[in-house]
């Protein structure tokens, strides 16, 4: 190895000494990424103080320490001389290298290694492999014989850099959420999440993103925009009408050229260096779905094959995507779990722990909207909320302009903009009528603007760039659209491992697991009632809102117990539940607002159903995928879609009517009756309602793989095929003589007649009881024998029936890590275990204020307190019998007065009590069965 003597230091790539050994004795401090004021503001926004990260010198191999607080002054990268004991004296250095080190002056222990051109205060410590000049100033500080190790011939470069990267990996922590990163550029990009800054903006729809890759993915939706063309199928008439028709046609052509020119305009700003993707289309041969990349096609084809190539090495669970496997593997890792000191709940990340601790303290960062005063816990939520105000302001001006009547537009004088537009279109203003002049003026104002204005529909749907080709519904993300398409295709990728039932969404499967496990994790804090679904708990809490108002809760407790205060009126409450109920009185929150009429709703499902009212017949008859076909048959409708936002469809139609042009946007489509407005574009079937059309389109989308062996017709499901096969059979000749019901087969008729004749062929040999089916008899025999033949392999518990064993085994599927040390009973959550341990400890924490009786659970004391409530004395004066229901009490009194309030519905006979009525109804039943048996016997003799 050649060594150059001089004053330039040792280059990093030659590493004449063991650089890993050198880093083991250094101390690193992170660079400052923003000033002290921004850091203090970010730390103050946290619900609690962030954990301090300090790596001990004796325990950590890289000896890195992160300062708990930052200053505005940039830190220096200081080098400390390693002790002589850390290097082996047996290792001998190279002679040439030794001479070179002897020529270098020794460095001090506080010498900085950053040069003058490196902006450390802005970027922090960057990656060593891409910024090697950081190590050019390293100098020798100890004698060479003690510092340099012997050269290892078997050590390769790749292994050396891999070890180096392991030592300095993830040394850039975020001071807000404590998340760490490998490179400072990744930390700078991550800080945009906390600041809420979104610097990358789409110049087509105005949507903003915080990462350039998200913007590139978003721009693909604008790549394949179709241009509408105008076909002149009607000959122009004479006079003024001909001039107006020529103006409309010329305007449409000019609009198309302007739209094409605006699409080819060079982008500016942050998007100037963003290339559009040039990938070709790739089509799936099974469902004809088109993808931009071939890798996306391969990933999509796994849905059809059902293959799951990625499996977990711990639990052997398989997945069809690598990202899903990576997300699942984190659930098995316990190395990074942090625990809450209050409730003991564990988390994999510190950021999740900080969010969880805010639920105990009751405090959260307050980001308020300046327009409406609404507050949010995260800056991203505030930015999304502000977009609602921006869309509302953008919609007000175009809507006012659209409401201008046509008569006032025609009366407007000819402006300079109108004359310039007429000269652009090659039309003389003096030779056209007022209707054509109005249209020219609108077009002139369109060209006079510096940029094309968006119509109100585009502004309203600016955040919904992914539209469904079946029902036309828009979504803001491509993943949401893919999940929505499962409704039309019938795809259900999520399957229950217990019963095999399939679901479209993963959270539907999670909710379905409650049916098997019978787990009820959602508990009411007031009465202790538990529920399996959060929606059930929300509906249950509405009962307490009526029974326990806020004044009742505040009047029975001392002031020191009222820890939750209202920020609006200052009233205090004992818990967050009563505080939330009180805040609803202030704001009456209905967060879901209709963009068209402004109506508010409390649930998003109600808003979705409400939006169907505003959909016009033209939008429902022709989905978005068919807009290009419809535009080819419209001469005036093209002007309506490319004209400025203040040119309404009524004005264009009036101008065309003045010119004598028949502007029928649906002239190439068959006329649909007024009663059935919505027609299918595939088969032509018509429907009265739009939902009927959407439901009908499932027939064309679902794959039909089951064929009838008689006529060859295909079906999607086995049940549909079974119903179809019965149409090929003869009529139902097997009729029940008692009730007249008809059956396809004689076996079905015989099984049905057992209900009338009470024929029970399967009888018990011990008690003589008869049953309709054999498995009923097998279940009944367990009562006499007491045999429990079904045994659980996990806990050795035995059961009498197989269904009971299957239901018991489902409890072992769900993890129950919380075990009681006294009785061994297991629980899923720690809160349930703590509540259970009160029984062993004898702690009855709930005491009745009236009688002093104590209870273990809050549900027990609530049930007990009902006995203290004042109730009417419903006691019979004759027999001293007590009743809870006034209805039964009044009927009971009639029996002592000689009345017969209980009547038979068949014959009208009345009885004084229910026992006599039940015996009488049983007599009617036996009469019907005897008549049916006699009728069957008579048919057998014939």
Swiss-Prot record:
It is found in: Nucleus. Residues 66-106 are annotated as: Disordered. One of its GO terms (cellular component) is nucleus. Keywords: DNA-binding, Metal-binding, Nucleus, Repeat, Transcription, Transcription regulation, Zinc, Zinc-finger. SUPFAM superfamilies: beta-beta-alpha zinc fingers (SSF57667). Its main location: nucleus. Residues 96-106 have a biased composition (Polar residues). A zinc finger (C2H2-type) spans 172-194, 200-222, 282-304, 310-332, 338-360, 367-389, 466-488, 494-516, 522-544, 564-586, 592-614, 678-700, 706-728, 734-756, 762-784, 790-812, 818-840, 846-868, 874-896, 902-924. The keyword Lipid metabolism does not apply. InterPro entries: Znf_C2H2_sf, Znf_C2H2_type. GO terms for molecular function: DNA binding; zinc ion binding. SMART domains: ZnF_C2H2. May be involved in transcriptional regulation. Belongs to the krueppel C2H2-type zinc-finger protein family. This is Zinc finger protein 865. It comes from Xenopus tropicalis. The gene is znf865.
């Amino acid at each position: 190895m050649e060594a150059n003597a001089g004053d330039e230091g040792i280059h990093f790539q030659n590493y004449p000494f063991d650089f890993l050994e050198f880093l083991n004795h250094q101390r690193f401090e992170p660079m400052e990424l923003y000033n002290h004021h921004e850091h203090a503001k970010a730390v103050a926004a946290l619900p609690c103080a962030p954990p301090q990260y300090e790596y001990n010198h004796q325990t950590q191999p890289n000896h890195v320490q992160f300062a708990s607080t930052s200053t505005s002054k940039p830190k220096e990268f200081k080098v400390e001389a390693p002790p002589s004991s850390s290097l082996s004296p047996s290792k001998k250095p190279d002679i040439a290298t030794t001479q070179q080190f002897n020529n270098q002056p020794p460095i001090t222990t506080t010498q900085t290694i950053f040069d003058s051109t490196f902006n450390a205060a802005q970027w922090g410590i960057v990656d060593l492999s891409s910024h090697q000049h950081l190590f050019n100033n390293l100098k020798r500080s100890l004698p060479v014989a003690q510092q340099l190790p012997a050269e290892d011939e078997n050590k390769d470069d790749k292994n050396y850099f891999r070890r180096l990267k392991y030592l300095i990996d993830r040394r850039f922590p975020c001071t807000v959420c404590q998340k760490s990163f490998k490179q400072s550029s990744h930390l700078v990009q991550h800080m945009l999440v906390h600041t809420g800054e979104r610097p990358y903006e789409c110049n087509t729809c105005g949507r903003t993103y915080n990462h350039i890759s998200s913007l590139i993915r978003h721009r693909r939706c604008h790549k394949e925009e179709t241009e509408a063309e105008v076909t002149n199928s009607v000959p122009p008439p004479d006079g003024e009408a001909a001039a107006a028709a020529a103006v409309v046609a010329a305007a449409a052509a000019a609009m198309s050229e302007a739209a094409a020119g605006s699409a080819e305009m060079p982008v500016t700003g942050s998007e100037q260096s963003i290339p559009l993707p040039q990938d070709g289309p790739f089509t799936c041969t099974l469902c004809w779905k088109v993808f931009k990349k071939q890798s996306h096609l391969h990933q999509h084809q796994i849905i059809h094959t059902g293959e799951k190539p990625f499996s977990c090495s711990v639990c052997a669970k398989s997945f069809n995507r690598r990202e899903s496997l990576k997300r699942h593997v984190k659930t098995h890792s316990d190395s990074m779990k942090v625990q809450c000191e209050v409730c003991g709940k564990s988390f994999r990340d510190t950021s999740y722990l900080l969010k969880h601790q805010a639920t105990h303290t009751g405090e959260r960062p307050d980001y308020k909207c300046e327009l409406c005063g609404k507050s949010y816990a995260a800056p991203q939520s505030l930015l999304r909320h502000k977009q609602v105000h921006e869309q509302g302001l953008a919609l007000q001006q175009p809507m006012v302009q659209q409401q201008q009547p046509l008569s006032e537009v025609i009366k407007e004088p000819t402006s300079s903009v109108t004359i310039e537009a007429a000269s652009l279109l090659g039309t003389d203003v003096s030779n056209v009528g007022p209707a054509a002049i109005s249209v020219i003026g609108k077009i002139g104002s369109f060209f006079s603007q510096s940029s094309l204005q968006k119509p109100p529909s585009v502004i309203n749907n600016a955040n919904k760039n992914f539209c469904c080709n079946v029902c036309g519904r828009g979504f803001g993300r491509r993943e949401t659209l893919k999940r929505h398409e499962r409704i039309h295709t019938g795809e259900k990728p999520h399957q229950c491992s217990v019963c095999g039932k399939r679901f479209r969404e993963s959270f539907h499967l999670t909710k379905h697991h409650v049916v098997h496990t019978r787990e009820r994790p959602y508990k009411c804090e007031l009465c202790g009632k538990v529920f399996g679904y959060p929606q059930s708990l929300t509906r249950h809490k509405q009962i307490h809102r009526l029974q326990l108002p806020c004044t009742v809760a505040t009047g029975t407790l001392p002031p020191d117990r009222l820890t939750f205060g209202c920020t609006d009126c200052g009233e205090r409450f004992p818990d967050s539940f009563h505080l939330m109920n009180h805040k609803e009185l202030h704001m009456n929150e209905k967060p879901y607002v209709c963009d068209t009429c402004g109506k508010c709703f409390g649930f998003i499902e109600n808003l979705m159903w409400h939006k169907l009212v505003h959909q016009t017949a033209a939008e429902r008859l022709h989905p978005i995928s068919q807009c290009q076909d419809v535009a080819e048959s419209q001469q005036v409708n093209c002007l309506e879609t490319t004209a400025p936002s203040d040119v309404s469809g009524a004005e264009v139609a009036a101008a065309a009517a003045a010119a004598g042009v028949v502007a029928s946007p649906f002239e190439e489509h068959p006329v649909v009756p007024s009663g059935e407005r919505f027609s299918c574009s595939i088969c032509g079937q018509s429907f009265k309602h739009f939902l009927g059309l959407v439901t009908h389109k499932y027939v064309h989308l679902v794959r039909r793989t089951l064929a009838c062996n008689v006529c060859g017709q295909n079906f999607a499901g086995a049940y549909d095929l079974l119903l179809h096969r019965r149409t090929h059979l003869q009529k139902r000749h097997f009729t029940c003589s008692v009730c007249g019901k008809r059956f396809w087969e004689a076996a079905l008729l015989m099984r049905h007649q057992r209900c009338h004749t009470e024929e029970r062929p399967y009888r018990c040999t011990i008690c003589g009881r008869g049953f309709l089916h054999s498995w009923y008899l097998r279940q009944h025999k367990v009562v006499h024998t007491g045999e429990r033949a079904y045994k659980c392999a996990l806990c050795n518990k035995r059961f009498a029936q197989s269904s009971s064993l299957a239901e018991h085994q489902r409890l072992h599927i769900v993890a129950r890590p919380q075990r009681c040390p006294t009785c061994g009973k297991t629980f899923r959550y720690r809160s349930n275990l703590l509540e259970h341990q009160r029984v062993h400890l004898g702690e009855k924490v709930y005491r009745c204020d009236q009688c002093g009786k104590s209870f273990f659970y809050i549900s027990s004391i609530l049930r007990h307190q009902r006995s203290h409530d004042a109730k009417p004395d419903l006691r019979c004066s004759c027999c001293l019998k007590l009743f809870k229901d006034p209805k039964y009490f009044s009927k009971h009194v009639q029996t002592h007065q000689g009345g017969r309030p209980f009547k038979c519905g068949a014959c009208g006979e009345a009885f004084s009590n229910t026992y006599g009525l039940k015996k009488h109804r049983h007599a009617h039943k036996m009469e019907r069965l005897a008549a049916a048996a006699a009728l069957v016997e008579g048919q057998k003799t014939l």
